[in-house]
Amino acid sequence: MPSKKKQSRTPSRLSNSEPPASPRTPASSTTSRDTDSINEEELRRSIEEASAAFPCLLGKSAIIARVADVASESIRGSKIWLSETSMVAASLSPGSTVSVSLASPESRFSRSFPLSSIKAEYGDDSESIIADEPGNYFVLTTVFSSSKVFKDAVRISLNLCYGLGCPVSGRTVFVYPVSGPSLSDQFNGNGRSRYDDVNHLSLLACKELCLELTPFRNMLQAKNAFESSYEQNGNGNSTPKTPANLQKFSSPRPKSPVSPIIEDSVFSCKQRFSSESSIDLREVLSNESSKKLLQICASSWLYPCSLLYGNFVSVPILSEICIFCVKRADKRPSDTSNRNHAFMINQETKVYLHHTLDLASEIQGRTFVQGLQFDEGENVGCEISKLGGLSKEYAILRDIIDSSSIKNSLSSLGLRPTKGVLIHGPPGTGKTSLARTFARHSGVNFFSVNGPEIISQYLGESEKALDEVFRSASNATPAVVFIDDLDAIAPARKEGGEELSQRMVATLLNLMDGISRTDGVVVIAATNRPDSIEPALRRPGRLDREIEIGVPSSTQRSDILHIILRGMRHSLSNIQVEQLAMATHGFVGADLSALCCEAAFVCLRRHLDQSSSSSNLPLEEAPIAESSSNMSDISSDSSDSASSCITISATTSGAQRSFSLDETVSLVADDIQNNGNSCSEQMLRKQGEHTLSVGFEDFENAKTKIRPSAMREVILEVPKVNWEDVGGQNEVKNQLMEAVEWPQKHQDAFKRIGTRPPSGILMFGPPGCSKTLMARAVASEAKLNFLAVKGPELFSKWVGESEKAVRSLFAKARANAPSIIFFDEIDSLASIRGKENDGVSVSDRVMSQLLVELDGLHQRVGVTVIAATNRPDKIDSALLRPGRFDRLLYVGPPNETDREAILKIHLRKIPCSSDICLKELASITKGYTGADISLICREAAIAALEESLEMEEISMRHLKAAISQIEPTEILSYKALSEKFQRLVHTDPQREEEVTQPGNKSRSLWTPLRSVAMFLRRHIAS
């Protein structure tokens, strides 16, 4: 009786972590010999034993945790989430690659291998060559942090759950970082290199991948155990309670460990993960056309991921989840070198799907080696680490970290190493990418500090979190502490500032002083507002060095574009890439990445339009538009972002953006699959014959939509106006081309002659003579960043805001040089100073600021100022001197030839009768400006419609009637201004007399007479 009573109490002691043991369960299910009865010491011994067989995939520093949650199946890719505390303790950065393995439930009671076989987790105990492969025990995945995960618990994605054999809730897992060797491991005490260490996992590119379909009958038990574990958790029935000897590394779980996400995912798993397939997959794979489509979809589904030989991967096929094993067609070599190699699935990887019989027949029918092909000469990590245009900054940072992170490297010589580096520059230039990429590939431990993550509402917790990061870095030297957006964490201390900010600054100052006594720790901070940082941080001993990353030059943009285009199928030649780099003035690395992304979408839309027009199957536009909108929101740092058929990874310094035919076919296949339709063999064959390739015209179209980041808040208008749209004024056109286009196209000529181009041009003349139109045309022809400013827009009622607006305008122009600043109606902005008697006015202060910006202490390099006015006599004389406005161009009314050209331009869009004579019209419109002629053409068209609304063309009488009604603009008062202010260098001597106004002839006659008078006066005086 007592025994029965004791047994009756057993269910009451069960926890909500695992289901009860069943008589018939696979290895993945919970048994009486599960890891609940294994303490931490035994688990550590198991890790040590397993690391001897797989040293590159498991080590003593592995994290011991339990499966607490399974993410929704909408999250694609293999991912695992740890608590923030575990991430910091293990020095893991979000997005790092880790290996995940299962502890063997029988390791305590037998002498079996301490890790659980994934093959056995699926209920297959048969012997095969895969049993000794690393993929049978380890799965490579990407790690992220989550505030919803408790300490010593993990949350896994559904794909990782399938890869591990569907472990039940509460199952013990080992998580181990598999990044490259740290800097401390590269040197021993004698300073000798240890690069020959075999315990390093190499990540190589895979060209071909062979997958074998796993028999569905072996997966029934795994499916039932996986479902029952979470169902029983939800009903309150679970496995026995965790013993006390494991409580020291297990955090308390919530009362309801199963979330609605798990219930949804399990329910979906029941629907899709079937042991009895509703279709014959062997028949599907035997059909070459359907097999080819499935292989393309599988390649897109698996990208990007890292695999090991022997891994199990899940692939959705026809609304069901199918499990494939990573194999190859030939027998594996006898050596064990593949244990140190993992392979990455990229855009070039070709996936081959086989069932068991098909794979066996293929092995017998081939005499050559068929298997996993690695690109041995190309290391994926090295390719990712290249940052375009930042080679100089990369070298500086490498010298600093190499000299500061190695213990006793400089202190033994009596030198003080650099302890802090401040990287500043505009957003999108690659500051964060530079720090993260270098720290990752140099091997040092990386600790990241983000303001929103450490700021807490409770007093003292923010400072404590910051202190824990620095303490962890000091215990894991060599280490780098990276502080992103330093201005948000440590702003300048001001009287009356926030108390939290002042406490954070004080804590950071103390921590920076503390690491000066610790060897092997370097602080790297990044900001785009260096003036907003606490000045005490920028003194020597804290942030000793400062690295400025500015807007890339044309050479740097070319380097960035070449790196981005390596991952894209394009048809651009080197000359076209250089032209694209020259045309993207002011673009930073993030802007160039966005430009390539937009060009890819332009090419994809063009390809889909062509496919839909030539195919009998209409393509739905809604899924494609949805995919395009989702694609722009993908971030490389987001852990929950779903992968897409077209993968575009955004990095600020030149992340690779690529797409190929595989993604397009996959996108179409997903669309057809979701709508329950079937894809025809003819469409697949037609799409397979052509390969998407981004052309130069795609980039030209993308440039109209992508603007430089620094110019987005400025009114940027580059109208589609060419020189052909401006009639006459050839002299003014030549002057503008010399000042704007020549410096871009003939830089060597200016350097050779030892001069610089004109830096400022003022156009003045009667209203309506195409001054603004020519400024718009020169901006469009030169394809430079064009900042159009109207004088009254810069004035503000607040004191100092007007001068600040002028200063900010020129700062943006310099940051996006070469650029053009166009001041329309500049006489309203730069009026003569001292007119008001009540002191210095707002216009006087704005004028002074404008003079300083045009020709002050800072030289304007790459910034051309073009201004237009019809009242040059109202402008301050200090602004008109050479050095500020080198050329003063009088834009007068057109002559007869110019009027004929203007009439031709305005009448080319209006249907005209054959009786219209442009030469006659030009002769009778003497004294009319370009604006008057434009009005004449419009009024003539209105007059034709007044006669009859069915009128199809205008005639000569309509134009003459309009001329008789419109009076020419008064221009006599402007001729005197041309004699006083015009200053230019004639570019066409043959037309000098025609271009020069009548007043200039009297001035040319007066010059020799004045010389003769001066000579006679000197002769008489002598």
Swiss-Prot record:
The keyword ATP-binding applies. Residues 1005-1022 are annotated as: Calmodulin-binding. It comes from Arabidopsis thaliana. This is Calmodulin-interacting protein 111. Keywords: ATP-binding, Calmodulin-binding, Nucleotide-binding. GO terms for molecular function: ATP binding; ATP hydrolysis activity; calmodulin binding. Residues 1-44, 230-257 are annotated as: Disordered. Coiled coil: none annotated. InterPro entries: AAA+_ATPase, AAA_ATPase_domain, AAA_lid_3, ATPase_AAA_core, ATPase_AAA_CS, P-loop_NTPase. Residues 9-18, 230-250 have a biased composition (Polar residues). It comes from the Eukaryota. ATP binds at residues 425-432, 765-772. Belongs to the AAA ATPase family. Interacts with CAM2. GO terms for cellular component: chloroplast; chloroplast thylakoid membrane. The keyword Coiled coil does not apply. Residues 33-44 have a biased composition (Basic and acidic residues). The gene is CIP111.
